[in-house]
Amino acid sequence: MIVQTFSLDNLLNGDEEGVPDPLADYRKLSYRDQLEDLQRKHHDRERELVSQITDLLEDSLHLKPDPRIRHFLDDFTDAGEALLTHFDKEEQIVFPLMYIHLSYDSETIKEVDALTSEHREQEKKMDSLKSRMHLFETSDWNLLRELLEELFTDLSVHISKEDDITFPNYIDLVTRK
């Protein structure tokens, strides 16, 4: 059996040779449709995943207190709260500004840049959590591990869509006039 592996970053950026770009359809959308896609496909699902993961961790701690799991839950809660706040900022402030301002607006550009910086912080938090996935290697943790992996993968795709496609498309649109 031949197993072929791919770099998620290369795959998302269309750099894997012979592999179709999984974001090709997304790239074809207008930036406004991209914003709707981000909210509908990523924000909603990631909110749900954060809630499910938090509930599973809290339930497990009630059954069997473990300081390592408590520490992971605390860090996950901090990262989850930052993520949800970030989504609210995107949905309530930045995305509406991007809908309204079809010409250069320094405030909107500043907000987009701030979101990109927040993405770097969120990636650091997720990397820290990923580094502790060994805590969940036993079969007792299958569901939690699957949900965490889904969240990490979805966030990676989500951030790539925003930072590599949507935000640059928007900035290109408003600066070329």
PLM segments and residue spans:
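Small-residue-biased structural context
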Residues: 1-177
